[in-house]
């Protein structure tokens, strides 16, 4: 975790602008993810002629690479400082675009082209984990650890914004100039972000001996488990709400997803100080309660308006879960280990979203689509009970390393 810069207290618009000036680098990294997201599956399957398995694998490789590299991103951010990690991650985003470009240029050699696409996706996954983790820690270093919840919230907002913008823009660029044009746009976005990041003032890396990964995991895993359980609700809505609407014979699944996203972003914008005012665990428990009600409404919905209200509540409830628990998880370790703690904590969400789809698909094929929303509500209820137990647990003293004093 970087050492915060000592300067007058920030608040209001000035604070938000300072945070946005850093998390915009995470926006750039997620824009490079969103731009090819709606293009590559069809390109691999329809243009290159590979099976749906390979089309899915090309997309999934990025997520696996992000999952595996995220703990390393946090540890290197603690050791080297977050700015270097952000620039490194953005370089990975640039190289992923180069991979797409060379894949397009070697389209006459399908196997080589596919390998280059896969390589680009792996590099993108590594780049995103470094840019995302680094930008959060850089933002905290700039505005101070008091505002860590707000930094995490803004990171989530720019993530959703970049993905929402990137997918339709990517389709437009692809229809305009093919895969090569899309690749050049991706490289351009990453290059501009790198050039903007390099002259920015750095923040010092924290001094002190880092804890081993096992020790960091031991401090944050309960918060990560609560996050993973709550993420199941997000996973079943994002993945299966279209099938749910089809099974009911309703229209409007896309609008339901829009409602979820609006509730998610709107809640973060409306309650920026909630975590500081009433505490991360209290906010998390309130959020779990709202998310449970929303998921239950979706599961028992007999009319489209019931499902839409449920999706809206689920989005609002899930919105602050990550920053609320993240603030507490990060503060459970010494300052020089907080980058590793944040990255390790985030892995639980990555894992949850990775396994929710297949497991929910099995449950759906056995018991029907509505049941997966009721099951997800049950998992969030377990997260609520776990967080309640964590709140009742006596606070632990977190010693700072002697060398950091």
From Swiss-Prot:
Cell inner membrane is among the record's keywords: yes
Entry-linked Pfam families? MFS_1
User: Membrane spanning segments where?
Assistant: 19-39, 47-67, 85-105, 107-127, 156-176, 178-198, 224-244, 252-272, 283-303, 309-329, 344-364, 366-386
Extract the Gene3D superfamilies matched here: MFS general substrate transporter like domains (1.20.1250.20)
- Keywords attached to this entry: Cell inner membrane, Cell membrane, Membrane, Transmembrane, Transmembrane helix, Transport
- Where is this protein chiefly located? membrane
Q: Which domain of life is it from?
A: Bacteria
Recorded protein name is Uncharacterized MFS-type transporter YhhS
Q: Which organism is it from?
A: Shigella flexneri
């Amino acid at each position: 975790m970087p050492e915060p810069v000592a300067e007058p207290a920030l608040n209001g618009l000035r604070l938000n602008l300072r945070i946005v000036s850093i998390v915009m680098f995470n926006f750039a990294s997620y824009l490079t993810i969103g731009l090819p997201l709606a293009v590559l599956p069809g390109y691999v399957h329809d243009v290159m002629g590979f099976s749906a398995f390979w089309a899915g694998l090309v997309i999934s490789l990025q997520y696996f690479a992000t999952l595996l590299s995220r703990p390393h991103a946090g540890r290197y951010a603690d050791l080297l400082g977050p700015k270097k990690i952000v620039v490194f991650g953005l370089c990975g985003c640039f190289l992923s675009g180069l991979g797409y470009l060379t894949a397009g240029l070697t389209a006459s050699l399908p196997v080589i082209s596919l390998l280059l696409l896969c390589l680009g996706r792996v590099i993108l996954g590594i780049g995103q984990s470094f840019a995302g983790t680094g930008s959060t820690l850089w933002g905290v270093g700039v505005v101070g650890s008091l505002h860590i919840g707000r930094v995490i919230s803004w990171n989530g907002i720019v993530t959703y914004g970049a993905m929402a913008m990137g997918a339709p823009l990517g389709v437009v660029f692809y229809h305009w100039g093919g895969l090569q044009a899309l690749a050049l746009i991706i490289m351009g976005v990453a290059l501009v972000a790198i050039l903007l990041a390099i002259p920015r003032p750095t923040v010092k890396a924290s001094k002190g001996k880092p804890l081993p990964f096992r020790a960091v995991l031991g401090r944050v895993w309960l918060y990560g488990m609560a996050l993973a359980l709550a993420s199941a609700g997000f996973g079943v809505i994002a993945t299966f709400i279209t099938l749910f609407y089809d099974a009911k014979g309703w229209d409007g699944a896309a609008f339901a997803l829009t409602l979820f996203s609006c509730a998610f972003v709107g809640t973060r914008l409306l309650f920026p100080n909630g975590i500081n005012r009433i505490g991360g665990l209290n906010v998390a428990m309130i959020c779990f309660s709202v998310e449970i009600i929303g998921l239950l409404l979706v599961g028992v919905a007999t009319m489209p308006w019931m499902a839409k209200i449920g999706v809206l509540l689920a989005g609002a409830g899930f919105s602050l879960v990550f920053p609320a628990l993240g603030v507490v998880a990060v503060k459970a370790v010494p300052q020089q280990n907080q980058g590793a703690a944040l990255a390790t904590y985030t892995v639980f969400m990555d894992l949850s979203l990775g396994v929710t789809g297949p497991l929910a698909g099995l449950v759906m094929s056995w018991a029907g689509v509505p049941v997966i929303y009721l099951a997800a509500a049950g998992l969030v209820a377990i997260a609520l009970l776990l967080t309640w137990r964590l709140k009742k647990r006596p606070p632990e003293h977190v010693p700072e390393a002697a060398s950091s004093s």
